[in-house]
């Protein structure tokens, strides 16, 4: 909702794939825009990319988390590689990765998930979109 409304918005954010410059700057830009647009926004940061979304490893970000990171390389959330071709393959515990990510998304009542990642990350983002999740995907490469 626009400024002045009382509804809480929850937006998820993750960085995936290889680490590179500008991830922090991009996250900061997205967060800054969200904080300007909405009075009551909560940004949920997933640790280590899709892995954090799969295993519900997250933290509620504060505005101060995005301060001082503009010129810092890498990502304050961490990143990991989760091969797209294995997203539908259960892990060693039998966990269906896509179902686990959907479960976390809905459990946390996210309105949208912002994904910063390369080619494989974009394929996974599209897979989640096909599953009905609201995705904003920002491509990057090393």
What function would you assign to each model-found segment?
Residues 37, 43-44, 128-142:
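Short, acidic/small-residue loops that bind anionic groups at enzyme active sites
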Residues 26-30, 119-133:
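Short Gly/Thr/Asp-enriched flexible loops that form oxyanion-binding sites at enzyme active sites
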Residues 55-113, 120:
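Glycine-rich oxoanion-binding loops at beta->alpha junctions
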